[in-house]
Each structure stands twice: as C-alpha cells, then as structure tokens.
C-alpha cells in the first residue's frame, strides 16, 4: 500500500490537541508515547506525518482508538456526546515532545 502525502495545510487539521489525563501521563512516562485527540477521518499515516511536521520528531508507530460518545440526559431529553478518535504515538528513542509553555 502506497502512502499519499497530504499537503501541509490539510495535515494541520489532523491533530486537534493533546490528551492530558492520568492515563495519558502514565503512558507517556512509561512507554515514550504521546496521546492526541485527532480528526475522525484521520488515519495512522496522516497522524504520523502531522506529528513529524508540527513537532519535528521521528515517529516509530501509531495506534488509533475510536471512542463512542457517552449517552447523556438533559432533563427529559436524551442524547449523546460526539464520538471521538485518539491516537497513541510511539516516538523513537531519544525523541520527546514537551507541551509545557516556558514563562519568561
């Protein structure tokens, strides 16, 4: 299967933001992984290209998880939250992404 390189503008829309949670922090410390919220139509190669473009790091592999939206009630009305997609990005040894902003 050949990989089609998307243009830089469309790759900017793939990553929606980092996932900052207890599980994501434990995974990051233990396995050199970073967790991102990604667009619903993104695939593994899109995520890999976007991370390498934005953060200037080398990506080893990508695992993607589809999360179903939770059912919620608002009074007598039932609905659900939107479905989401997360990507677990394995970085090559020695690579690191730091999300903390430095104050000057």
Curated annotation (Swiss-Prot):
InterPro entries noted in UniProt: Nucleotide-bd_a/b_plait_sf, Ribosomal_uL23-like, Ribosomal_uL23/eL15/eS24_sf
Chain segments annotated as transmembrane: none
GO biological process entries: translation
Recorded GO CC terms: ribonucleoprotein complex; ribosome
Annotated GO MF terms: rRNA binding; structural constituent of ribosome
Keyword Nucleotidyltransferase: no
Keywords, in A-Z order: Ribonucleoprotein, Ribosomal protein, RNA-binding, rRNA-binding
Family membership: Belongs to the universal ribosomal protein uL23 family.
Subunit annotation: Part of the 50S ribosomal subunit. Contacts protein L29, and trigger factor when it is bound to the ribosome.
Function statement: One of the early assembly proteins it binds 23S rRNA. One of the proteins that surrounds the polypeptide exit tunnel on the outside of the ribosome. Forms the main docking site for trigger factor binding to the ribosome.
Protein name per its UniProtKB record: Large ribosomal subunit protein uL23
Native species: Polynucleobacter asymbioticus (strain DSM 18221 / CIP 109841 / QLW-P1DMWA-1)
